[in-house]
Regions:
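Predominantly a Rossmann-like dinucleotide-binding segment in NAD(P)-dependent oxidoreductases
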Residues: 1-84, 91, 215
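Hydrophobic side-chain positions on well-ordered alpha-helices
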Residues: 7, 182-183, 211
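C-terminal glycine/acidic-rich active-site capping loop/insertion
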Residues: 35-48, 52, 82, 126-200, ...
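Contiguous beta-strand/loop segments that form the cofactor/metal-binding neighborhood of enzyme cores
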Residues: 63-145, 174-188, 207, 220
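C-terminal hydrophobic helical "lid"/dimerization subdomain
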Residues: 196-213
Length: 220
């Protein structure tokens, strides 16, 4: 993701005009109030209400699309302006799916999709496509097809080699823990999820949930 951020910042795809992104996972059980089956043999199990209670920020948006939007804002630096969202509700009243349209500052448009209906054992996926007036960037985290590809209008193609298996399922807690220790020790570090990124993510999802209820376009 940091490499994608560098490519966009270099100007190789020009001014961003449109972003389309999707995030999918196997979490229908959680959003209907059933404990996560993958945690059956764990000592500490997450409370299902964390994801299924609408009064506790339950739902696919807060539970999963927070990751999607944070990643998108990290690499694009866009600022949200207006949001419209439709969803499929779970029995507990939270969102199983999200179909979100965005208008960013400067007139950039975006289409964003979230879905909890991936079959168990598959893992789901996460991809970001950024289209500019000089080219496009394709970033895919789905397991066994990870890629970072840049194509420009003048025929350039940059294909960053990614080792198979380094996508969505390669994440561990080791790097965040190491970073926290570095901060405590006063060492230099790079914050890949700073407050500006997270603020834009919260503004976007807050507007999306307001739009679900109002069925209208909402200001982010």
């Amino acid at each position: 993701m940091a490499k994608a951020e560098e490519h966009i910042a270099s100007g190789i795809i020009g001014d961003i005009k449109h972003v389309d992104t999707s995030f999918s996972s196997s979490l229908v059980d959680l959003f209907q109030g059933i404990p996560l089956s993958e945690s059956d043999d764990h000592t500490f199990k997450p409370l299902a209400s964390t994801w299924s209670d609408p009064s506790k920020a339950g739902g696919y948006g807060w539970g999963q699309l927070s990751h999607m939007f944070a990643g998108m804002y990290k690499i694009t630096k866009l600022n949200p302006e207006k949001v419209f969202c439709m969803s499929v509700p779970s029995p507990t009243g939270v969102d199983y799916t999200d179909a979100i349209s965005l208008r960013f500052e400067g007139g950039v448009t975006g289409a964003f999709s979230g879905c909890a209906y991936v079959p168990k054992g598959y893992g789901g996926g996460y991809n970001i496509r950024v289209h500019g007036d000089k080219g496009s960037l394709f970033l895919d985290f789905e397991i066994n097809r990870e890629r970072l590809l840049v194509r420009t209008n003048d025929g350039q193609e940059i294909n960053e080699k990614t080792e198979v298996g380094c996508g969505t399922h390669a994440y561990t807690t080791q790097k965040p823990i190491n970073t926290l220790v570095d901060i405590c020790l006063g060492k230099e570090y790079h914050n890949h999820g700073d407050v500006s990124i997270n603020l834009k993510m919260v503004r976007t999802l807050d507007a999306a949930y307001r739009s679900m209820k109002s069925e209208k376009l909402e200001i982010a």
